[in-house]
């Protein structure tokens, strides 16, 4: 099953785990030093830019060195966080795979239930229409079984016949005269 199963449950909120904003917040709480290092790098670059505009080359060189230190700090935070949270991330990945498998099974089960309901409705519709057709055939057979009675009725009670049209009514009047 490489393709997802079609269903009306596709966009159901029950089948969504975590949004990108929730994931960003979770990662920010897990490793707060990485965004801190990125902010320090950005601030050092900003100060170096201002020093360059002011023409202060000594301050600009200090800020470029500070940028390098901030980037080193960020890199160390990434590596240390990866080592510290490595086993937890592996467990989380396994958990997310299990959750994904469970959710895909739930979607598949919901899709199958939906198909079963549609199949029951379809069978019910076919049975109703088969019963209606059988009743119509039975009524037609019952009507054909007494043709003499129909002929006698039409001869006795012409006023009860449905009018077929104006032209036929005029022809009937002319034929009586």
UniProtKB/Swiss-Prot annotation:
Keyword Mitochondrion: yes
Transmembrane intervals: 33-49, 68-87
One BP term from GO: mitochondrial respirasome assembly
UniProt-listed Pfam families: HIG_1_N (PF04588)
Region spans: Disordered: 139-158
Protein localization: Mitochondrion membrane
Subunit composition and interactions: Associates with the respiratory chain complex III/complex IV supercomplex.
Family membership noted in the UniProt record: Belongs to the RCF1 family.
PANTHER family: HIG1 DOMAIN FAMILY MEMBER 1A (PTHR12297:SF3), HYPOXIA-INDUCBILE GENE 1 HIG1 -RELATED (PTHR12297)
Protein name: Respiratory supercomplex factor 1, mitochondrial
UniProt source species: Aspergillus niger (strain ATCC MYA-4892 / CBS 513.88 / FGSC A1513)
Gene name linked to the record: rcf1
């Amino acid at each position: 099953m490489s393709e997802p199963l079609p269903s009306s449950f596709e966009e159901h909120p029950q089948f969504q785990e975590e949004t990108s904003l929730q994931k960003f917040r979770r990662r920010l709480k897990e490793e707060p030093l990485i965004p801190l290092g990125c902010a320090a790098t950005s601030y050092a670059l900003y100060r170096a830019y201002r020093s360059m505009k002011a023409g202060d080359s000594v301050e600009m060189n200090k800020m470029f060195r500070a940028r390098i230190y901030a980037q080193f700090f960020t890199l160390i935070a990434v590596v240390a966080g990866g080592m510290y949270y490595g086993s937890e991330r592996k467990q989380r990945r396994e958990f997310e795979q299990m959750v994904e498998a469970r959710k895909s099974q739930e979607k598949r089960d919901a899709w199958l239930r939906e198909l079963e309901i549609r199949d029951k409705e379809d069978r019910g519709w076919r049975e109703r229409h088969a019963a209606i057709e059988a009743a119509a055939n039975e009524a037609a057979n019952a009507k054909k079984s007494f043709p003499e009675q129909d002929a006698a009725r039409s001869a006795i009670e012409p006023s009860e016949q449905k009018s077929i049209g104006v032209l036929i009514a005029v022809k009937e009047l002319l034929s009586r005269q």
